[in-house]
């Protein structure tokens, strides 16, 4: 796929342009310079043609604790991109940072560079004073306002017009899309860099280095995956700034865009209430979740350590009893392959389709062996069960009246279905519906999800 990188100094509107092009608010946008630190990837479609857009951190001559790493990330983006959008701001004018970015880009004579002048709001284009911008050495800029969508169509036409120069690369089908979530500094970015085999994300001992949710595609054993790394979720009392609040929202959005979750824990410290809260997001999302215990190389171990830690996890995450638990060290590159082995196991279980006759045999047998308790004045009677379409295994059980269902019996049936059909690593959902129209009007269907049930 054609790759286009957005490059420029801080606060020229790179992230606003990125969000405008992908028609979604993924990159954090704020008036504070330097908000974007990592590369952020998104897909753009224009006139039935697609390309990948890369947002980058701002280039500046000023010293910053992260500036050297940010510049490294920008360099990675330039290296992998086919086209560079060099963005300047008409509102702020040019300064030493613009010249610094221009000097860096001029070193890449093999790259196609489109000079873009942003933040042209309501000015008449014919009255613009562009003389100072010619000093950057890239000719006349394309005039846009990313915030107000002015000139965006012309910019997209220019990019698509260059697409044929770079050939058409066949797009490989994704095996899985998953996000990595966890509290700050558990090693999410270190794992992502291990998966990608390069320093794609800033890694630091300072908690909260990653602010955006960062999409990346990579190949493992010749199969294509998409991973979404996220900012660490802090305790509510520590979400002090707008930027941190945006990061929490990005994490929630990353989960909504994923098909699977890697919940990362720090194995070198005790589990915290914060870990439990983040685990609750996995439960609410109702997505397959792999609990990944990181930094296992730092733990003093004997033959019982792993099992004891698993028991602690099961005690803290009672609402995720089906989630597999694996132990890795992202920094030391230990047992990373177990992530993909587990993903493949989960994918296989998600694809299981059960014949209606076999499913009814299992449910009716379970029903006969263990009769439902009397609840709300009567006993539940199940007459028919079928598998419904869904992202996770979903089953509809027709009964005399869902009001007679006790949650313990729903859990019993869930466990029987899991045992019979090998659904040990995925969430499943049971819908209890009345078999006749009259009861359907008088009662509510019951949705049983994992370890509890909600009235629909």
UniProtKB/Swiss-Prot annotation:
GO molecular function terms attached to this record: GTP binding; ribosome binding
NCBIfam families, per database record: GTPase_EngA, small_GTP
PROSITE patterns, per database record: G_ENGA
Biological role stated in the UniProt entry: GTPase that plays an essential role in the late steps of ribosome biogenesis.
Domain of life: Bacteria
Subunit structure: Associates with the 50S ribosomal subunit.
Chain sites annotated for binding GTP 1: 8-15, 55-59, 118-121
Family, similarity comment: Belongs to the TRAFAC class TrmE-Era-EngA-EngB-Septin-like GTPase superfamily. EngA (Der) GTPase family.
Record's protein name: GTPase Der
EngA-type G domain location: 2-167, 176-351
Gene label: der
Protein species of origin: Mycoplasmoides gallisepticum (strain R(low / passage 15 / clone 2))
GO biological process: ribosome biogenesis
InterPro entries found in the cross-reference section: G_ENGA, GTP-bd, GTPase_Der, KH_dom-like, KH_dom-like_a/b, P-loop_NTPase, Small_GTP-bd
Ranges of residues in domain KH-like: 352-436
A Pfam family assignment: MMR_HSR1
Binding site for GTP 2: 182-189, 229-233, 294-297
UniProt keywords, alphabetically: GTP-binding, Nucleotide-binding, Repeat, Ribosome biogenesis
